[in-house]
């Protein structure tokens, strides 16, 4: 009889211990899920202002109007661009070097792998050469990409839509003045778009600063040595409203880069990001990443610094190192990011149709952020 009671007692203790373990695991999983989901910001008192249909109408208006004015101010022609390129061409953008492109094969073209573009940085430069564009002339295109490894939040989507642009310059124009003059032109077009949107949607438009402030990533590091690069960007952009952070990719005084950049398109000494302060999310909003592209010497040194000298054997890199490609300046301007900025939206999913975690969609809906 004692043995029976002992077994019952053991069973009860086992159930209690198992229950405690399950409770602990549930709590741990919940905490982990919350940490992953903490990237979502839900602004207090947020109101979408425009209905979904009004938002769709405004998106079309901004995109149609901006690309016409942008092309005119920058002397750029609209061209068609690929959705995917062959892996062996070396034309795809490696971004920070760790993002996995979406790849596939094609039944009618055996022994070749294709990748959905992550950007058109290298393709545009090759196209300018093939289409015989002269210095001062350029192109822009609608670029649609899938970035499967993006961390999804208010600003980041796995679907990327941007105006990719590129312009031929002379070798002697590869300098800071050319870069900053181009940045000022882009800022002027964006600022003018604020007025265009205000005429049609005065209740929704965000008011932008009148000027853009220039600073190098090293100057920014020295200004805020104890902050992370992202914290530095937030502090300087909040102070000035709109900032162009220059020289991104190379090691700074502390031995670390401000941010990652592929070694084979931007010259790390002649590039940067355009940032606007965005009150809805209390952070800097990157609208454009751009730069003067590598020449032969910059390509050599940056490939070496990135331990990527094996890329020299790819067709694009061979052509560039042989001096067969034009010198260029180029970049991308986020279409959804620009709509988000001008319409004062709190989530990029309010201005583009993409995919999101179900609990993010529900949380946004409860806070009047309707994802398309």
Language model features by range: what are they?
Residues 146, 216-372:
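A translation/RNA-centric and nucleic-acid-associated enzymatic feature enriched
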């Amino acid at each position: 009889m004692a043995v029976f009671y002992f077994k019952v007692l053991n069973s009860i203790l086992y159930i209690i211990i198992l229950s405690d373990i399950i409770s602990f695991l549930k709590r741990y999983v919940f905490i982990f899920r919350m940490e992953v989901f903490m990237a979502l910001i839900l602004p207090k008192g947020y109101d979408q202002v425009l209905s979904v249909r009004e938002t769709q109408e405004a998106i079309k208006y901004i995109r149609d109007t901006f690309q016409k004015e942008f092309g005119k101010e920058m002397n750029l022609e609209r061209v068609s661009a690929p959705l995917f390129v062959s892996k062996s061409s070396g034309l795809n953008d490696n971004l920070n070097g760790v993002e996995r492109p979406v790849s596939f094969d094609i039944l009618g073209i055996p022994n070749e792998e294709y990748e959905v573009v992550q950007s058109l940085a290298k393709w545009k430069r090759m196209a300018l050469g093939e289409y015989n564009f002269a210095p001062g002339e350029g192109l822009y295109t609608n670029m649609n990409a899938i970035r499967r490894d993006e961390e999804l939040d208010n600003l980041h989507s796995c679907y990327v839509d941007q105006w990719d642009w590129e312009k031929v310059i002379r070798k002697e124009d590869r300098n800071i003045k050319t870069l900053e003059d181009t940045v000022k032109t882009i800022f002027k077009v964006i600022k003018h778009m604020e007025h265009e949107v205000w005429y049609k949607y005065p209740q929704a438009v965000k008011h932008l600063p009148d000027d853009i402030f220039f600073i190098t990533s090293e100057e920014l590091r020295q200004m805020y040595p104890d902050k992370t690069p992202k914290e530095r960007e937030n502090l300087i952009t909040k102070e000035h409203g709109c900032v162009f952070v220059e020289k991104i990719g190379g090691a700074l005084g502390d031995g670390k880069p401000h941010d990652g950049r592929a070694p084979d398109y931007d010259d790390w000494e002649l590039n940067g990001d355009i940032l606007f302060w965005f009150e809805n999310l209390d952070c800097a909003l990157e609208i454009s990443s751009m730069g003067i592209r590598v020449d032969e010497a910059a390509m050599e040194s940056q490939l070496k610094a990135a331990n990527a000298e094996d890329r020299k054997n790819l067709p694009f890199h061979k052509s560039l190192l042989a001096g067969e490609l034009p010198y260029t300046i180029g970049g991308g301007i986020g279409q959804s990011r620009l709509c988000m900025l001008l319409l004062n939206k709190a989530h990029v999913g309010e201005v583009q149709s993409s995919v999101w975690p179900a609990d993010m969609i529900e949380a946004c809906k409860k806070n009047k952020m309707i994802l398309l």
